[in-house]
Amino acid sequence: PFLFDELFALFGKKREDYVEFLAVEPWYRFEFSDGSKLDYGGSIEDTVSEINRLSPGEGKGYVDLVNFSKRIFKVGFEKLSDQPFHKFWTMVRQVPALLALKSYLSVYRLVSSFLKDARLRRAFSIHPLLVGGNPMNTTSIYCLIHYLERKWGVWFPRGGTGSLVDALVLSLIH
């Protein structure tokens, strides 16, 4: 929600005066073809317990994935997300950091390096799908979302995304 709070603040408004954000719990519920299920969200301890219930011993791989995604987040979100790449050399200077973060791997391949269970690999590779990407060929930089969700949670605007658009329009009119 903080990014929308910042956006509304640019116009001297408070986001909560226009739209309410609700915390989502669980963040995702995965139902697999074998009938098994995984609820993802909450504390990292709850997630590890849920993963180990589904696939004993895989919880450590998930923790390692989140720790790696924090490294990606530090570069991809904190350092680069608000930077213009309008000059070729601006992007070229980022190549060493992006290589160190294995950006040449797809989301699915990076997730697979931490998790062995095929169900978990699919579940924890979904983020590119949310923006129309394919986890099999979208850069692993999108794995930063694992840490982003851990840091800030998953939120939903009451009334759906249309209510968020309406709130932005109203804030501009007033």
What do these predicted ranges mean?
Residues T138-E149:
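Residues forming anionic-ligand binding surfaces in small-molecule and nucleic-acid pockets
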Residues F4-D5, V48, Y108, V165:
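Generic structural marker for isolated residues within well-ordered, non-membrane alpha-helices
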Residues P1-E25:
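N-terminal FAD cofactor-binding segment of flavoenzymes
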Residues H174:
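Conserved small/polar residues in nucleotide/adenosyl-binding loops
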Residues P96-V107, E149-L170:
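Short beta-strand to alpha-helix junction loop
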Residues W27-F32:
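Short polybasic amphipathic segments
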Residues S33-T139:
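Rossmann-like flavin
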